[in-house]
Amino acid sequence: MKLSVYGKGGIGKSTTSCNISVALAKRGKKVLQIGCDPKHDSTFTLTGFLIPTIIDTLQEKDYHYEDIWPEDVIYKGYGGVDCVEAGGPPAGAGCGGYVVGETVKLLKELNAFDEYDVILFDVLGDVVCGGFAAPLNYSDYCMIVTDNGFDALFAANRIAASVREKARTHTLRLAGLIGNRTSKRDLINKYVEAVPMPVLEVLPLIEDIRVSRVKGKTLFEMAETDPSLQYVCNYYLNIADQILALPEGVVPSESPDRDLFALLSDFYLNPSKSHVMSEDEELDLMMV
């Protein structure tokens, strides 16, 4: 099974991806997480350091694939999760999609691509160009990380459009949304009413999720010394269980940009009597 995780930049994709990878490993699966971001920090909370990238290794070996061994590019992370960082081209040059393709090519050359029960691609940012949509070509499911804010859901809608486009020629489905660190889900609910899709989980506003990223540890590792965090791990285990159940998923029909802008704006500008706009939501609106 191959999964891709997308979402607005800074929404918590890598933290979410690492914890889902560990949750899948806890369920007995052999997992490989591939970071698809030039920052090459996707697997930081699994390994505790920035591992060398595949593109750097290829350059060192002058692109002689036969001179590269699995241990040169695959690093063992927490919970037995194997980790790879694709890396990226120099800033302002090259194509990230090419780097993803080279990563998959090398892993296949090493007979590693098909050795795992689950491969999870953690993909940068919210601008899904043809290059960084490349992981969708290899994926069975896409998961979109969001929060209860305008910008994150607007980005989710654009990613849903990419899933729909790729599903024309690939066996790709959208597994659903994952709400990350949000105290409410009313705007998420409003969005999925307009664009029907599953909501796999909504994680509450838990500060330890953010802290885990800074510490370079997953919530599962932190829970070993602080059992009170086990309830947070259960959110990720629930997501893993849903994915392992092989959900039908959906081919989404995204909302036109202007329609979605009007829908989400109206939610803020004309709140229902039961909805009182919070200071955080007012700030979100000011940033639009």
Swiss-Prot record:
One BP term from GO: light-independent chlorophyll biosynthetic process
What is the required cofactor set for this protein? [4Fe-4S] cluster
- NCBIfam families from the UniProt entry: DPOR_bchL
Cofactor details (free text): Binds 1 [4Fe-4S] cluster per dimer.
UniProt organism field: Trichodesmium erythraeum (strain IMS101)
GO molecular function terms listed in the Swiss-Prot or TrEMBL record = 4 iron, 4 sulfur cluster binding; ATP binding; metal ion binding; oxidoreductase activity, acting on iron-sulfur proteins as donors; oxidoreductase activity, acting on the CH-CH group of donors, iron-sulfur protein as acceptor
Pfam families listed in its UniProt record? Fer4_NifH (PF00142)
Entry EC no(s): 1.3.7.7
Q: Which domain of life is it from?
A: Bacteria
Record function comment: Component of the dark-operative protochlorophyllide reductase (DPOR) that uses Mg-ATP and reduced ferredoxin to reduce ring D of protochlorophyllide (Pchlide) to form chlorophyllide a (Chlide). This reaction is light-independent. The L component serves as a unique electron donor to the NB-component of the complex, and binds Mg-ATP.
- Catalytic activity, per the record? chlorophyllide a + oxidized 2[4Fe-4S]-[ferredoxin] + 2 ADP + 2 phosphate = protochlorophyllide a + reduced 2[4Fe-4S]-[ferredoxin] + 2 ATP + 2 H2O
> Which residues constitute the signal peptide according to the record?
none
To which pathway does this protein belong? Porphyrin-containing compound metabolism; chlorophyll biosynthesis (light-independent)
- Ranges in coiled-coil conformation: none
Protein name, as recorded: Light-independent protochlorophyllide reductase iron-sulfur ATP-binding protein
Alphabetical UniProt keywords: 4Fe-4S, ATP-binding, Chlorophyll biosynthesis, Iron, Iron-sulfur, Magnesium, Metal-binding, Nucleotide-binding, Oxidoreductase, Photosynthesis
